Design a protein with these regions (language model features):
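Hydrophobic pocket-lining residues within nucleotide cofactor-binding pockets
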Residues: 27-29, 154, 181
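A short acidic, helix-capping loop that chelates divalent metal ions and anchors anionic groups
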Residues: 50-55, 110-115, 154-158
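Solvent-exposed loop/turn segments at secondary-structure junctions
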Residues: 85-87, 107-109, 152-156
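An active-site-proximal structural segment forming one wall of the substrate-binding cleft
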Residues: 124-142
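Single conserved hydrophobic/aromatic residue that forms the stacking wall/gate
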Residues: 176-186
């Protein structure tokens, strides 16, 4: 974090060339401490949406670079992708700037304010599993990503058994699909 060291892999095939940046880091939880490269790490940073007042929703390179530089100026070191995976270019920038990322699936407020059991009524799990798999597959090689967030503020209070049956397999899926043992889940 803060001062990343990235390597560049170069692949040539005939006249074609492809360059890919990559880095190494370790992540672990020891007791109550979150460690990156063996050192305690304290998450300081915002949740944000990919939008701006003057450009609208979606990825915008100028807005993103400006925002990330402002976060550095504020002494932030982490960014939660709320509440969906961002454009891949954002992860590339976070890799280069040493900003730690909590990657999140687009599962916001499942069941919040509903009278029926959302985990039994709506066919969400198949879609949610597919989105989680796609996010992990796409972002697993970004050294900036240190946590997978399965969702935002789900209602687990009103239907606890259904919620457990819904979230447990997704949590296990995130564990199975981690290609390296140094990624954590939220």
């Amino acid at each position: 974090p803060g001062t990343p060291y990235l390597y560049t892999a170069l692949v040539r095939f005939g006249k074609d060339e492809y360059r890919q940046k990559f880095g190494f880091r370790s992540v672990e939880v020891s007791g109550h401490k979150f460690l990156i490269n063996g050192a305690p790490f304290y998450f300081k940073g915002p949740c944000k949406h990919e939008d701006s007042a003057f450009r609208g929703r979606g990825y915008d390179a100028c807005v993103t670079v400006t925002d990330l530089k402002l976060y550095e100026w504020l002494n932030a070191n982490a960014l939660r992708m709320s509440h969906y995976p961002y454009a891949e270019e954002v992860y590339d920038l976070c890799d280069r700037l040493g900003i730690v990322v909590i990657d999140e699936t687009p599962a916001v407020g499942i069941g919040a304010g509903t009278a029926c059991d959302p985990y039994q009524t709506f066919p969400l799990k198949t879609y949610h599993s597919a989105v989680l798999r796609a996010m992990i597959e796409r972002d697993k090689n970004h050294p900036c990503v240190v946590l997978w967030s399965l969702g935002n503020e789900p209602d687990t209070e009103h239907f606890p058994e259904s919620a457990r049956d819904y979230w447990r397999p997704l949590y296990e899926l995130s564990l199975i699909h981690i290609s390296e043992p140094t990624r954590q889940e939220a």
